Amino acid sequence: MAEKPTAKPKAAEAKDQSDSYAIVEASGQQFLLQPNRYYDLDRLQAAVDDTVTLEKVLLIKDGKNDATVGQPYVKGASVELKVMDHRRGPKIIVYKMRPKKKTRRKNGHRQELTRVMVQSISIDGKALS
């Protein structure tokens, strides 16, 4: 009987890397950010291809270690984002009317968004991803 190798398959290694994430506070909301993924945040005052650093990191989870929870923020932690595009969200229609009256009001709104790609998640200058 031949022994099976004990090395991890490549899929498992990729899964370990994708298990790392950070929960950050941006635009008045909390986002779960994973490396090499893109997200839409409220409009940031940065040009396309600029790098933005978020310092308000609430939690960091490495693929192999336990989570590091901040009180309220993790000290020395940061997330680097690259601005990919400025775009607008879907149109939201707000329609108000009063029954049995001739009062009707229709408004439309499109939120200004910035699409960002997560470059790296780091703690104390050491990149997790």
Swiss-Prot record:
GO-annotated molecular function: rRNA binding; structural constituent of ribosome
GO process terms (BP) = translation
- GO cellular component annotations of the record: cytoplasm; ribonucleoprotein complex; ribosome
Keyword Iron-sulfur belongs to the record:
no
The entry's keywords: Ribonucleoprotein, Ribosomal protein, RNA-binding, rRNA-binding
Q: Is the keyword RNA-binding assigned to this protein?
A: yes
UniProt record similarity statement = Belongs to the bacterial ribosomal protein bL21 family.
Q: Which PANTHER family match?
A: 50S RIBOSOMAL PROTEIN L21, LARGE RIBOSOMAL SUBUNIT PROTEIN BL21M
Q: Which NCBIfam families match?
A: L21
What assembly does the database describe for this protein? Answer: Part of the 50S ribosomal subunit. Contacts protein L20.
The protein's job, in short, is:
This protein binds to 23S rRNA in the presence of protein L20.
Name this polypeptide is given:
Large ribosomal subunit protein bL21
Q: Which organism is it from?
A: Prochlorococcus marinus (strain MIT 9313)
Q: What is the lineage of its organism?
A: Bacteria, Bacillati, Cyanobacteriota, Cyanophyceae, Synechococcales
Q: Which gene encodes it?
A: rplU
